[in-house]
């Protein structure tokens, strides 16, 4: 009985080894090169937009408090990149409400954005 069990175990082990060694793995040229991954676009673009958003935080606060302050082009581009190309809920995780995020996104996507129209006053802090 012990020889049957060990034969069965050995057969299953050999079949598993043959199955694993026989499959092809996908090519991963750039996955080991961290510089290529970081310069590839997406991740760095999100970090740059987040850094730009940090520099225009005062502008965004005044945008909501005064209702007449205009957002700059760079600030709107950062909001656009973060909400469309990165994680859409990132602004919410940074402390903005979903209503404030929608107002910012709507203002920056409007044709008159970038400092040429007054801010909407629908969101109150």
From Swiss-Prot:
This protein's record includes keyword Signal: yes
Subcellular location: Cytoplasmic vesicle; Secreted
Residues of the signal peptide: 1-22
GO cellular component: cytoplasmic vesicle; extracellular region; vesicle
Entry keyword set: Cytoplasmic vesicle, Fertilization, Secreted, Signal
Tissue distribution: Restricted to female reproductive tissues, specifically accumulating in storage vesicles of the unfertilized egg cell.
Main localization category: cytoplasm
The keyword Secreted belongs to this UniProt entry's keyword annotation: yes
GO biological process entries: double fertilization forming a zygote and endosperm; regulation of double fertilization forming a zygote and endosperm; regulation of protein localization to cell surface
Function: Involved in the regulation of gamete interactions during the double fertilization and to prevent multiple-pollen tube attraction; mediates the redistribution of the gamete fusogen HAP2/GCS1 to the cell surface after secretion upon sperm arrival.
Similarity annotation: Belongs to the plant egg cell-secreted peptide family.
Protein's name according to its UniProt entry: Egg cell-secreted protein 1.2
Protein source organism: Arabidopsis thaliana (Mouse-ear cress)
Gene: EC1.2
């Amino acid at each position: 009985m012990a020889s049957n069990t060990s034969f069965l175990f050995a057969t299953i082990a050999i079949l598993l080894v043959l199955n694993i060694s026989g499959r092809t793995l996908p090519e991963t040229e750039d996955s080991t090169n961290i510089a290529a991954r970081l310069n590839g676009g997406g991740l760095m673009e999100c970090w740059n937009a987040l850094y730009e958003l940090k520099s225009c935080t005062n502008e965004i606060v005044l945008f909501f408090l005064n209702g007449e302050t205009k957002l700059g082009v760079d600030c709107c581009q950062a909001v656009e990149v973060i909400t469309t190309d990165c994680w859409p809920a990132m602004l919410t995780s940074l402390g903005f409400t979903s209503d404030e995020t929608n107002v910012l996104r709507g203002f920056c996507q409007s044709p008159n954005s970038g400092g040429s129209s007054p801010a909407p006053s629908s969101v109150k802090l």
